[in-house]
């Protein structure tokens, strides 16, 4: 960088990592913490293929509750700002999120990777079908 504030002239590639904090501002509960989504559930009981085999109703209920809550929240200023950067940045940009919600997409982000999957999509191990 030759001058302060001249970053756009020297930086072409950006990778951004977001986590629970960005969606918590919209009212999405985090997985950890005193009121987190894991409270009252062991990860092994709701978030593994083995859990689904053992108790598919519990797993389905757990995720149905998360999906229902997601319908009641909206992207916040952080989601909007990242979507604007995605739209206007001429270079390469990748937004990597640890979140399973769709708030980045709803804000308009296109160059996005979900590290832990997406709450609104599923994959069948038996037939390799994808559901959204």
Predicted segments with their positions:
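Conserved catalytic core of sirtuin-type NAD+-dependent deacylases
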Residues: 2-132
């Amino acid at each position: 960088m030759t001058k302060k504030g001249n970053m756009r002239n020297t930086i072409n590639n950006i990778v951004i990592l977001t986590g629970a904090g960005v969606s918590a501002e919209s009212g999405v509960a985090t997985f950890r913490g005193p009121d987190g989504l894991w409270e009252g559930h062991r990860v092994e009981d709701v978030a593994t293929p083995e859990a689904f085999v053992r108790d598919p109703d519990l797993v389905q209920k757990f995720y149905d509750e998360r999906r229902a809550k997601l319908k009641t929240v909206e992207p916040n200023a952080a989601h909007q700002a990242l979507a604007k950067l995605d739209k206007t940045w001429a270079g390469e940009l990748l937004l990597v999120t640890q979140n399973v919600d769709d708030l980045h997409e709803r804000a308009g982000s296109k160059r996005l990777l979900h590290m832990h999957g997406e709450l609104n999509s599923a994959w069948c191990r038996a037939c390799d079908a994808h559901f959204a």
